[in-house]
Amino acid sequence: DFFANPQRARDTAVMGEVLELRLIEELREGQGATYSPSVVYNHSLVWPGWGYVSASVEIPPAGLPAFFTDVKKIAADLRDKEISADELARAKKPRLEQIAKARETNGYWLNELSGAQSDPRRLDATRALISGTERVTAQDVRRAAQAVLRDDNMWMLEIRPEAGK
């Protein structure tokens, strides 16, 4: 969950960006298997101890086993080795730009400040979002991968079309 350790949540968010970059490099650029692999990370603001990272892809059903293999391989690599300074910058820069741009909208502030009157941690989290993201290191990304991208808590979901349709 986010409030148990906001910096860890930011570390995990950057790790998710690195995972997505690697999936794009492998699946789109390397294999031409799909155009848009996606990674989503969620740290609950409500339920203690809850959060997830998910990777998804639109791919022909025959490509699913290879996708799962690639995700596991990339996850293991993120757990076992530090990422380069270049890869860290490529993960953080777009995220920081996205945050800065979002902060110019009312929707961002409505979402960020929702509930702040009853939970002041939300204000602290909003204030520290950019500096906390800037602070993420390659070691932090590796620690996040070791904590989250574990084989023992990973599960796969396949959504396939009905046969013949």
Where are the predicted features?
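Glycan-association/targeting regions that enable binding to alpha-glucans and other polysaccharides
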Residues: 150
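M16 family metallopeptidases and their MPP-like homologs
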Residues: 1-6, 28-135, 153-161
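Carboxylate-rich, divalent-cation-coordinating active-site regions
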Residues: 25
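His/Glu-based metal-binding/catalytic segments typifying zinc-dependent metallopeptidases
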Residues: 1-22
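Short, exposed beta-strand-loop hairpins at the edges of beta-sheets
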Residues: 145-147
